[in-house]
């Protein structure tokens, strides 16, 4: 199987894991432990290492711009902490957007846990970063969103989270301990931070299987969205402002590692589109089979922070036998996704249309098609 071999990953976290509980041979401590040894950090590292046991995990202090230059093998990372709980797109969100845009590293962020029943449910910072993949929590025994999993979109109005997955993990054979803050680690962890560590581990495994996705966060996000095929029972009733079909299902590895076709376009702002469109054909289509297609693109955080909107608005259209079979044309999202069944065996004509363009930022556009 695929185990993250050859892949480096980062965790941004002020606490440190207890070394007797984790695999220290695949763990590199690059920062001082500002919060000492913590239950939370131990749990995050355990989940990641269980999911991608051969990946090397580099720990950085909490922050949105880890200095990864000295470790070029780092391809993926995760942030399982939160800063702000309101609707504002903050400097931390901007900094993470810039980090992903400049370094081409796929970064996962926790959607956040709503601890108060009267709270606002806004996705927490830095999970509002548009280039990041924000992860909601699903209870594995019901396949429903956790009641505490945050879902409300920021002032930018882009849909968050983009994915949601299992958030409850148990390591019954781990030795219990009391951490440096007086909290007891008992091998059990639950929350969106756990789902985030798990997602980063899954992506490390994908990079092991398909190196093509390395250094392409725009394709990685499209892949995670199209691979979210296992339906979440209460997705529509839980996430009230997500009208797209992202984060309505759980990513399954079999639908990330197999049965997909991917491509990307990269260059200066004026590249890649003929007029306002990119048009191509998908062949070997099978009638009545299910297809999911997503596009995703990266943007500079500074523009989003200044203008509170996306610098490029790109839409997705799928045509078969001269008829538009599916389309997704949101105005605020940095991704589009469609889910449909083929009407015939005819080729699909894919049209990616840049509906609006500020002229700011490069074209960094990823595409993925999944088929059952």
Which functions belong to the PLM regions below?
Residues 5-9, 52-57, 72-77, 102-107, ...:
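Loop/turn elements at helix/coil->beta-strand transitions in domains of secreted/extracellular proteins
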Residues 334-342:
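Beta-sandwich interaction modules
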Residues 163, 208-290, 306, 326-335:
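C-terminal subdomain of the subtilisin-like protease fold in secreted/lumenal serine endopeptidases
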Residues 13-15, 122-207:
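Extracellular S/T/G-rich loop segment that most often corresponds to the catalytic His/Ser-adjacent loop
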Residues 219-223, 278, 308-309, 317-320, ...:
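C-terminal edge strands of extracellular/lumenal beta-sandwich accessory domains
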Residues 14, 28-95, 136, 216:
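Subtilisin-like peptidase catalytic core
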Residues 1-32, 163:
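Acidic-leg catalytic submotif of subtilisin-like serine proteases
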Residues 291-307:
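Short amphipathic, basic-aromatic surface patches that mediate peripheral association
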């Amino acid at each position: 199987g695929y185990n993250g071999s050859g892949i480096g990953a980062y965790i941004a976290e002020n606490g440190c894991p207890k070394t007797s509980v984790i695999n220290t041979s695949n763990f590199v401590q690059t920062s001082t432990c500002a919060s000492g040894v913590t239950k939370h950090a131990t749990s995050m590292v355990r989940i990641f290492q269980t999911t991608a046991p051969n990946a090397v995990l580099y720990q950085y202090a909490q922050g949105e711009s880890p200095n990864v230059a000295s470790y070029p093998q780092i391809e993926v990372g995760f942030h399982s902490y939160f800063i702000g709980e309101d609707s504002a797109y903050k400097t931390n969100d901007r900094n993470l957007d810039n980090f992903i845009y400049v370094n081409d590293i796929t970064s996962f962020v926790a959607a956040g846990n709503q601890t108060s029943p009267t709270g606002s449910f806004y996705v927490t910072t830095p999970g509002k970063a548009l280039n990041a993949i924000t992860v909601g929590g699903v209870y594995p025994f019901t396949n429903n969103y956790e009641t505490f999993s945050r879902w409300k979109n920021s002032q930018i109005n882009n849909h968050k989270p983009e994915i949601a997955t299992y958030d409850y993990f148990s390591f019954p054979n781990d030795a219990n301990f009391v951490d440096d803050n007086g909290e007891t680690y008992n091998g059990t962890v639950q929350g969106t931070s756990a789902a985030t560590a798990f997602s980063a581990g899954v992506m490390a495994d994908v990079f092991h299987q398909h190196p093509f996705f390395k250094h392409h966060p725009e394709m990685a996000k499209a892949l995670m969205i199209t691979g979210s095929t296992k339906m979440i029972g209460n997705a529509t009733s839980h996430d009230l402002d997500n009208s797209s079909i992202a984060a309505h299902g759980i990513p399954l590895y079999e639908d990330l590692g197999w049965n997909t076709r991917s491509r990307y376009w990269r260059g200066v702002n004026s590249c890649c589109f003929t007029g306002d469109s990119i048009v191509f054909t998908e062949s070997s289509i099978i009638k009545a089979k299910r297809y999911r297609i997503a596009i995703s693109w990266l943007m500079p955080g500074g523009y989003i922070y200044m203008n509170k909107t996306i610098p490029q608005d790109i839409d997705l259209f799928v045509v078969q036998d001269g008829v538009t079979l599916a389309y997704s044309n949101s105005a605020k999202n940095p991704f589009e996704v469609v889910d449909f069944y083929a009407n015939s065996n005819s080729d699909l004509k894919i049209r990616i249309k840049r509906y609006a363009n500020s002229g700011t930022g490069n074209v960094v556009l990823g595409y993925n098609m999944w088929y059952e």
